[in-house]
Amino acid sequence: MAKILSFSDDARHQLEHGVNALADAVKVTLGPRGRNVVLDKKFGAPTITNDGVTIAKEIELTDPHENLGAQLVKEVATKTNDVAGDGTTTATVLAQALVREGLRNVAAGANPTGLKRGIDAAATKVSEALLGKAVEVSDKAAIAHVATVSAQDSTIGELIAEAMERVGRDGVITVEEGSTLATELDVTEGLQFDKGFISPNFVTDAEGQESVLEDPYILITTQKISAIEELLPLLEKVLQDSKPLLIIAEDVEGQALSTLVVNALRKTMKVCAVKAPGFGDRRKAMLQDMAILTGAELVAPELGYKLDQVGLEVLGTARRVVVDKETTTVVDGGGQAADAADRVAQIRKEIEASDSEWDREKLAERLAKLSGGVAVIRAGAATEVEMKERKHRIEDAIAATKAAVEEGTIPGGGAALAQVLPALDDDLGLDGDEKVGVSIVRKALVEPLRWIAQNAGHDGYVVVQKVVDKDWGHGLDAATGEYVDLAKAGILDPVKVTRNAVANAASIAGLLLTTESLVVDKPQEPEPAAGGHGHGHQHGPGF
């Protein structure tokens, strides 16, 4: 396919137009008084959102050169969202300001490579300075503040704080569409996996259609159990203790399943069999996790265990097990806390070492099950459009809260970036174009504050000057229009979010400034309509 080429200033200005188009659509959403953006959908109701990355992902420009610029800024928003889960609009505003100031200096004769080095050095220094100013987030009230600021809703903030308190910092908090007007929290305490009973004859609670086992023994094996002879020695020992038994195996079938069902129906013993979750190596790892949580030994031939030769010593325990047709929930497993902590540390290392997004996601799920369960926030609203918008806000707030717990918080409202400017006072000892690069970052850092003020109906430049002159942590509460101690007012940002926004904006701006040519596909000319012979009759059936 034929290509169109653009070079030097022409290329960079076309990229800048694309950057501005996307950034102008996104930055109106910044701050508590930010506007919404309506996104058209091919199917269903339009989406109303103020989430930067959601808006950015929808934007494709018709001009291929400008579209490259838009896609570069989209990358800033997406990467910031992936790493920190929030701060996408801040990153976009910073990138636009860095590109604008950078191109102005390139046009005046500055060397793009020198500017890039200065920008990168300044971004690193700002990141270090912000981290040094961060305050640890530990108590529930501080967590609720961070979540409230991100979601712009105190009810959502309280729910997220409650969820995090109950499932722990590594616990999974998911968001679903609710079926009522209220937004609700539901927490699964303990371990839950997506496999239910193999036979409905194991049900002990006919009304709830559940098998409920109180203080049971738990057998966990990688084997498929077909012959009852394999299980008989163990079943007899369990029966002597008059305890229920949960069997988690690759499968239970044939004679073994029939015998278990007969014993359950006759109430000779309370028993329930479920299939192990997952596949292959992941299944084995998940079974090992369950064994650690319940204090069981994983019965597997490769570990030296044969099912017909083991006793009660390989069985785990729990306070309660509830099994329905789709899920199994183990509450208060009898494993040692130290063993679980070691396993958690091992999985964390695996997450850090993995370069596969899918593997990391699955490892994170295992980590959550080991470290505290799963919380589900159900977003309630009057209409589908409102529900989707609320769901987006809750997801952003969860990500921001987890980032805050991880690295701490700094004053929000754009004030921290404006007040960290003294870190760049000596231009980092650089000179020439690198020094200019530092000054470009200095000008860009106040832009998020300016747009937060602008969107709230204030003069952005006046607000910036006032905030820069104030002590650290004092700034504009855009929701009320007053200048306050931001930490006391609960206006906080996760430092991880802000640091990533700066780093990603600097990275993309540097790449764009050092771009010397663009290569895009030449648009295809529309083919002329084919001429016909003019007869109006149809050939064949008229489908």
UniProtKB/Swiss-Prot annotation:
Keyword Isomerase: yes
Basic residues: bias regions: 534-543
Enzyme class: isomerase
GO biological process, one term: protein refolding
Cystine pairings recorded for this chain: none
Subunit structure: Forms a cylinder of 14 subunits composed of two heptameric rings stacked back-to-back. Interacts with the co-chaperonin GroES.
Keyword ATP-binding: yes
Gene Ontology MF terms: ATP binding; ATP-dependent protein folding chaperone; isomerase activity; unfolded protein binding
Region annotation (Disordered) ranges: 523-543
Residues the record lists as binding ATP: T29, L30, G31, P32, D86, G87, T88, T89, T90, G413, D477, A478, A479, D493
Pfam families to which the protein is assigned, alphabetical: Cpn60_TCP1
Keywords annotated in UniProt: ATP-binding, Chaperone, Cytoplasm, Isomerase, Nucleotide-binding
Organism in which the protein naturally occurs: Salinispora tropica (strain ATCC BAA-916 / DSM 44818 / JCM 13857 / NBRC 105044 / CNB-440)
Name of the protein in question: Chaperonin GroEL 2
UniProt-listed Gene3D superfamilies: GroEL (3.50.7.10), GroEL-like equatorial domain (1.10.560.10), TCP-1-like chaperonin intermediate domain (3.30.260.10)
Main localisation: cytoplasm
